[in-house]
């Protein structure tokens, strides 16, 4: 906006959100609420577990900074599958954000069906599933932003509850402001980070 101020328009209401903006961005970028660039943001649901290894449920321990790990998953009772709406079935590119407890809160991974040998997977109630609108934003770009110190250093402040039971509410996730560059720029940023990361790993 003018004079270095940022405004948000919802319907006819215009609000000054300058104090929410963590840093300046180039003119071709936009600050947007996560909910405006996603088709689905929702906590998973509490599963009914089963020893039958058919439908894995993604818990916080499956989401590591090293990546998504299906090996740590437990399984839901196959008979409970009809209680899951279709949108709750994880899709390629879904971001899975750990939303409960100190030490795990804020950790994120990207769901990849190629790493899941089973037919499908769902998330448990400690994981928030974020489904980006792929025409506008890359999952990998959002992942790198949320993994950055900019977000991770303040994530506990944005959560509620006692120290041991910190909770990142769905409302907080939906309202999170994200700096979005043009699509081609997102692609270049992702490629650059991948290159640097692979060099660092040597």
Q: Where are the predicted features?
A:
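Glutamine-centric residue-chemistry signal
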Residues: 60, 152, 165, 186-187
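A short glycine-rich beta-alpha junction/loop motif
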Residues: 119-128, 155, 160-180
């Amino acid at each position: 906006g003018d004079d270095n101020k940022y405004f948000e328009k919802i319907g006819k209401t215009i609000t000054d959100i300058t104090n929410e903006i963590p840093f300046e961005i180039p003119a071709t970028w936009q600050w947007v609420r996560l909910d405006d660039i996603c088709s689905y943001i929702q906590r998973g649901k509490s599963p009914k577990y089963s020893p039958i290894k058919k439908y894995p449920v993604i818990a916080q321990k499956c989401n590591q900074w090293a990546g998504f790990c299906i090996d740590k998953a437990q399984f839901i009772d196959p008979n409970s599958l009809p209680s899951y709406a279709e949108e709750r079935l994880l899709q390629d590119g879904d971001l899975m954000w750990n939303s409960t407890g100190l030490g795990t809160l804020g950790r994120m991974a990207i769901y990849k069906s190629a790493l899941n040998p089973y037919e499908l997977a769902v998330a448990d109630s400690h994981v928030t599933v974020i489904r980006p609108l792929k025409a506008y934003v890359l999952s990998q770009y959002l992942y790198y932003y949320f993994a950055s110190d900019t977000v991770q250093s303040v994530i506990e402040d944005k959560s509620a509850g006692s120290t041991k039971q910190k909770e990142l509410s769905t409302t907080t996730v939906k309202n999170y402001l994200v700096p979005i560059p043009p699509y081609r720029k997102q692609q270049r940023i992702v490629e650059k980070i991948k290159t640097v990361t692979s060099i660092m790993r040597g």
